[in-house]
Amino acid sequence: TTQFARTRATAQPTVTALGLMPTVVPATSPSHIQDVVTEIRKHPGKTVLVVGHSNTVPAIVEALGAKRPGAICDSRYDNMFVVIMAGDGKASVVHSTYGEASPRDTTCAAMR
């Protein structure tokens, strides 16, 4: 997660249910994307929850070796990307949604 309240609140139900201690990776760091990837790679073979922002998640997915998703609207809070890291180093991504659907924002170019 990042230091911001929205990402922490999104992660909180999972953190509480599984008794986890979240790792905070500052979103304001110039090396944020690589810092997140480094943290993920510390847990090979494990499931890692990354709660991020519309302007960083696509780059994180790509940095993990999967196809970069399209732009995400700032007003969309229901996107979920599952990156599957294969043993051979290849990665793939599945895009889904969760929870209550975000209202359709017709002003967002990414949704047109």
Regions found by a protein language model. Give the residues of each.
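Phosphate-coordination/substrate-recognition cap region in phosphate-metabolizing enzymes
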Residues: 1-72
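Conserved histidine-centered catalytic loops in small-molecule metabolism enzymes
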Residues: 1-23, 89-112
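Short, surface-exposed, polar/charged, turn-prone segments marking secondary-structure boundaries
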Residues: 26-28, 52-53, 76-80, 110-112
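Low-complexity, compositionally biased segments
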Residues: 38, 81-82, 103, 108
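Ligand-binding grooves and catalytic loops that recognize ribose/phosphate and carbohydrate rings
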Residues: 58-64, 85-98
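Domain-level recognition of soluble alpha/beta enzyme cores
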Residues: 69-89
